[in-house]
Structures are given as structure tokens and as C-alpha cells.
Amino acid sequence: MESSAGDPYRRPARRTQWLLSALAHHYGLDRGVENEIVVLATGLDQYLQEVFHHLDCRGAGRLPRADFRALCAVLGLNADGETATEDANSAEAASTNPAAGMIAGGDADVREEARLALRADPPELTFRQFHARLCGYFSSRAGPRLPRGALSEHIETQIRLRRPRRRRRPGSPSLHGGAYGERVAHLEEENSSLRELVEDLRAALQSSDARCLALQVGLWKSQSDIPEAAAHELQRAQGALAEAEARARRLQRGQVEVRLRTEEARQAVRRSLHRVRELEALARRVPCLQRQVQRLEAELRGYRSEGPQLLTPQQASPRPGNRNGEPTAGGTRDSDTTPEGVQRSDSRDTDEEDEQLFRSVEGQAASEEEEEERWQEKPGRPQAHGEVPLVQPSGCVSRCDDQTAETLKASFGHCDGAEHICTLELETHVTRLGEQLQTLGTPEEEAELQQMVEAEHLRLELQMVETERVRLSLLEEKLVDVLQLLQRLRDLNISKRALGKMLLNALDRNPSQEGTCGTLAILDTLHQALVGCELLQRNPSAPASTAPAHTNPFLISC
């Protein structure tokens, strides 16, 4: 025999579980012998009818499924929980005793039947279904019923059969006279009174307990709705919080992207400004370069006009009066000295390119001087006191020609006019010098080509400068328009979210374009978006910003 702690139906019942105790007592699952339980168990059908009547507050004759489940929860008839507990107890008993394991197998079937009896599948239950489920739950668990005497069976039978209630009948005349008959009549009257009292007590207890159960079911439903509503509200709040966090993360990513693109646009504007400054510096150098090109072209034309004109040397004839005098070409030489000096003074003003050309000519002249010195050192050459008339070429405008002519005059100034060998050698040497001077035209042509190439490069750079200036002026105008529109929108109190959305849309429309063209396209798209803003269309006469234009750091002055 298990103890009362192991069997929940053998513990004394609380007042809130009189129905459970009455059902357990009726089906042999004793929860403690108490007078009120015995009284309630005598009219179990009426007890269940009172409970159903109080639960059916609408009077429709049907009990909702939620109310039946709440009643089971109040009574502690949780089939799943009890099944799990009793399964654990059965498993422990089966491990200790094989016979008890066989009994536990049968108990598992009984518990399954009890759990199925409490399962209220229909949405609403009639009294017959309500009675069948509660009684079926306990009848499936019913054990051996307690022995009852004939008097108890008679009382229960009388109570069940007495419908409606019948009060005491008027006393009949006693058949037996005497004191014994009076005593029997008195006892019967007391028994009838006791039966009526028991019936009244049972009805009152059943009605009050049914009312108490109905109130407990309502309280259970109200309390069960609160956690569900709170859980639903908490779940909804958590969903809103998650959505807000996701929106905040998207906004943060958008802000980071806007900052990055703004920084890229700022860097592009800085590069454009730096390029504009470079182009302005180049533009300031253009007039100087043009003057230099014009000067070089003038010098080149002078070289072309004077270079191929080489005068042939005059034939020297021996004159008596001229042996110790001045040479006949002295006047010509003196006349050529003045323009050569003027040209020499002009050539000193040229740049490093002219200096390189002069150094090459001086090197050639130095080599000629070395040849003249070797020619003078030949043995057996007669020395004369006369001078040989020389003709200085007028086409050479550099200092090397003067030095070469002076060297030749110093070498052959004292030669005798009668010696034709010296004259022929001098003419041959002068002719060779003329040919060498003609060969100097090749570096001059190269210099001319180089100057033409440089002039073409300068022209192309100038054209690029002009094109870049026009493009930057357009970019400046677009920037000024965008900044003015932004200032107007700021005066109209536009929201930062709407302004950021327009900027992101303008940036997203040109994702693949980079560089200056992409910046201009983005500015154009942003300008169109700002012009089409509803706030500006609703307020076309909104005042623009009164700030001066030179305070804007994005303005470009070309």
C-alpha cells in the first residue's frame, strides 16, 4: 500500500477541491474521510450539474472548451503532467519489482484512457459530454471501491430517486399503540428530518462550491490572459526594437557612405582647384613663351637668310705700293664689322639654347685653329712682310667666325704676294672653311625642327588650358547653382533625412562614373533633384541666401 504522499487522491482535500474529492471518493480513490466529502459524493450528478450551470453563465446549455480546460487546470487535472510523474514512478517501481512492472504496464493504459477522456476536442461541450469526460477520467483510474453497508446504499438510492424534493408527509396514525409505537414514529420523524437536513446541506455545499469553482475558473482565465497579452506585447515590442535597430544600422551605413562620397567629392574639387591653379600658372607663362617663340623664329629666319650667303675670296695680285700697306679688303672688313657687332650684341640676349649652338660653333673654330697652327709649323715655309687680302664671310654671325678670320690674317698677313703657292693654299683653306660653315646648317635645321615641335606643344597646351578653363567655368556655375538651391532649402527648413536621400539618389544614379566627368554628372543629377524638390515648387518665391559669394569655399575663380 502506497503512502498518502505518493498518491494525490489519498491526501485530505482542500475546500477548493471538493468536487475533485467527491469524484475520487465516489470512484474509490479516497482522499480522506470527511463528512462534507461524503455528503457531496452522495449526489454526484447533481453536483456536476450545479458546476456546469454556474460555468455556463450565458445559459446556452453549452460550455466553451477554454472554460473546461480552465476548470481542469483549477482542479489540477493536468493529464500530461500527471502522466509524466506517474510514468517516472512506474519506471522506478518496475526496476525494483518485475511484478510491479507488469502492473505498471496496465496503469499506463489506464492513464492513457484518462488523458483521452480529458481531451476536449469539440469547441463547445454539452452537459452530457462534460459529465462523461470528468467521470470517465476518474472511472478509468477507479480502484476497488470501499465496502458500503446496506444503509449507505439505501440512503444514496433514496437521494438519487427523490426528484423533486419531497418534504415530510403529515404524520399517519400509528398502527401500534403504546409507547413503542410512539418511539418508532419519533425515530422515523428524526430520520426524515436528518435526511432532509443532509439533502439541504448537500445542495447548499454543491451550490456554493460550484459558485466558488466558477469564480476560480474566471480568475484563472483573467490571469492566464494577462501573461499572454504581456508576452504578445513584449514580442511586439521586441520586433519593433529589432526593426528600429536595423533601421538605425541602415542609417549609420548610409551616413558613412555619404561621408565617404562627400570626402571623395571634396578631394575631386581639391584636385580640380589644384589643376586650375597649375593651368593658371601655365597660362601666365604663355605670353612669355610666345615672345620667346617669336624671337626664336626671327633669329631662325635671320639664320636662313644669312647662312647660305658665303662670299668667295677675291684674287690677290702683287702690287709694289701695296706690299707694305694695308690690304685691299680692309674697307670691306671694316664695313662688315659694325653689323656683326650689332648682331653679336643681340645674340648675347638669347637663352641657353643659343649658348649651346655657340659652344658647338666655337668648338669647330678651335679645331680649325689647331689645323692652322700645324700648317704654319711646316719647315721651309718662306716668311713675307706683306699681307694677303682676305675676304671675311658676312653670313657668319657668331664669335667663332671673327676669331677664325683673325687667326687666318695673323697667319698669312706677312706672306709675299709673289708666292702663288701660299695664295693657292689660302684659297683652298678658305673654300674648305666655307664648306664647313655650310655644313653648320644641319644643327640649325635640327634646332629649327625642335623649336617647331616646342611651339606645337605650347599651342596644344594652350588649347588644353582654354578647354579646361571652359569646363571648370561650367563646373563652377553648376556648383554655385547647387549651393544656392541648398541654401534655399535650408531657409525653407528641409529635413536632413530628405536632403540626405536626394544626395544618395544622386550618387546612386552614376555609380560607375569616376573622375571629373563623374563629378560633373553627379552635380547635374543633384541639381535636377534639388530643382524638382516639392518644397521649392510649393514655395517658388522663397528668398535665397544673403551670404556673399566669396565666402563659399567651392567657388572657383578662373
From Swiss-Prot:
Any one Gene Ontology molecular-function term assigned to this protein's record: calcium ion binding
Ranges where the record places region Disordered: 161-183, 304-395
Basic residues: compositionally biased ranges: 161-170
Keyword Coiled coil annotated: yes
PROSITE patterns: EF_HAND_2 (PS50222)
Keyword Coiled coil: yes
Signal peptide interval: none
Stated name of the protein: EF-hand and coiled-coil domain-containing protein 1
Organism of this sequence: Mus musculus (Mouse)
Gene: Efcc1
